[in-house]
From Swiss-Prot:
<dbReference type="GO" id="GO:0009022">
    <property type="term" value="F:tRNA nucleotidyltransferase activity"/>
</dbReference>
<dbReference type="InterPro" id="IPR015847">
    <property type="entry name" value="ExoRNase_PH_dom2"/>
</dbReference>
<dbReference type="GO" id="GO:0000175">
    <property type="term" value="F:3'-5'-RNA exonuclease activity"/>
</dbReference>
<dbReference type="InterPro" id="IPR050080">
    <property type="entry name" value="RNase_PH"/>
</dbReference>
<dbReference type="GO" id="GO:0000049">
    <property type="term" value="F:tRNA binding"/>
</dbReference>
<dbReference type="InterPro" id="IPR018336">
    <property type="entry name" value="RNase_PH_CS"/>
</dbReference>
<keyword id="KW-0819">tRNA processing</keyword>
<feature type="binding site">
    <location>
        <position position="86"/>
    </location>
    <ligand>
        <name>phosphate</name>
    </ligand>
</feature>
<feature type="binding site">
    <location>
        <begin position="124"/>
        <end position="126"/>
    </location>
    <ligand>
        <name>phosphate</name>
    </ligand>
</feature>
<dbReference type="Pfam" id="PF01138">
    <property type="entry name" value="RNase_PH"/>
</dbReference>
<comment type="subunit">
    <text>Homohexameric ring arranged as a trimer of dimers.</text>
</comment>
<keyword id="KW-0548">Nucleotidyltransferase</keyword>
<dbReference type="InterPro" id="IPR027408">
    <property type="entry name" value="PNPase/RNase_PH_dom_sf"/>
</dbReference>
<dbReference type="GO" id="GO:0016075">
    <property type="term" value="P:rRNA catabolic process"/>
</dbReference>
<comment type="function">
    <text>Phosphorolytic 3'-5' exoribonuclease that plays an important role in tRNA 3'-end maturation. Removes nucleotide residues following the 3'-CCA terminus of tRNAs; can also add nucleotides to the ends of RNA molecules by using nucleoside diphosphates as substrates, but this may not be physiologically important. Probably plays a role in initiation of 16S rRNA degradation (leading to ribosome degradation) during starvation.</text>
</comment>
<dbReference type="GO" id="GO:0006364">
    <property type="term" value="P:rRNA processing"/>
</dbReference>
<keyword id="KW-0820">tRNA-binding</keyword>
Length: 237
């Protein structure tokens, strides 16, 4: 039995609000239950030095949590003078996932930076960030086309992500904090809307997991991500 009375495959209610702020070219507030993340996509001319002259664009991401996004206040990383290892890992995951969704040649020598700021955390912040960032990216690309910056839509796939895990011996989808903190296994899965995997990150926190359990978790992830694609499409329509 899950603490929230959800079934093993049941994801939390998802809300995607577009145009949440007025300045960013793409702005989305995404809510996975009590987890809330603001995803802003900003377009700038030019690319990082290592990309210059290649005729391709670039997508990067930054991730942070507000000091009181969690049960107790955490200092801002800026106050500590550097980003933590977890933050760096998550923003690289978000950026890699978004780049896999695009044909960078069609972006021209332009950069899109997606800022994912966690307003409230209750598990699954990185997967919510990826799912919301994808919608913000779509809106930023639409803006670029409307301004004549690009001629063709570079988006190859929609992408979405979900957490799955083993909790009290059972495979479950979309872990909230109380489940995540006690899970024997925690896995994050990023997929395209064509059913292909972009990234699978899985770690046994307690007991090692079997191949059969891994397959069960991946099936739950596929089922949950299909629902997330439906939510994205509904928001974009």
């Amino acid at each position: 039995m899950r603490p929230n009375d959800r079934t093993a495959s049941q994801i939390r209610p998802v809300t995607i609000t577009r145009n949440f702020t007025c300045h960013a070219e793409g702005s989305v507030l995404i809510e996975f239950g009590n987890t809330k993340v603001l995803c802003n996509a900003s377009v700038t001319e030019g690319v990082p030095r290592f990309m210059k002259g290649q005729g391709k664009g670039w997508v990067n991401a930054e991730y942070s949590m507000l000091p009181r996004a969690t049960h107790t206040r955490s200092d801002r990383e800026a106050a500590r003078g550097k980003q933590g290892g977890r933050t760096l890992e998550i923003q690289r995951l978000i950026a890699r996932s978004l780049r896999a969704a695009l044909d960078l040649k069609l972006l021209g020598e332009n950069t899109i930076v997606v800022d994912c700021d966690v307003i409230q955390a209750d598990g699954g912040t990185r997967t919510a960030s990826i799912t919301g960032a994808c919608v913000a990216l779509v809106d930023a690309l639409t803006w670029m086309r409307s301004k004549g910056i690009i001629k063709t839509n570079p988006m190859k796939h929609m992408i979405a992500a979900i957490s799955v895990g083993i909790y009290k011996g059972n495979a479950i989808a979309d872990l909230e904090y109380t489940e995540d903190s006690e899970a024997e296994t925690d896995m994050n899965v990023v997929m395209t809307d064509t059913g292909k995997m972009i990234e699978v990150q899985g770690t046994a926190e307690g007991e090692p997991f079997s191949i059969e359990e891994m397959h069960e978790m991946l099936e739950l992830a596929k089922h949950g991500i299909r629902e997330l694609f439906d939510e994205q499409k509904a928001a974009l329509n």
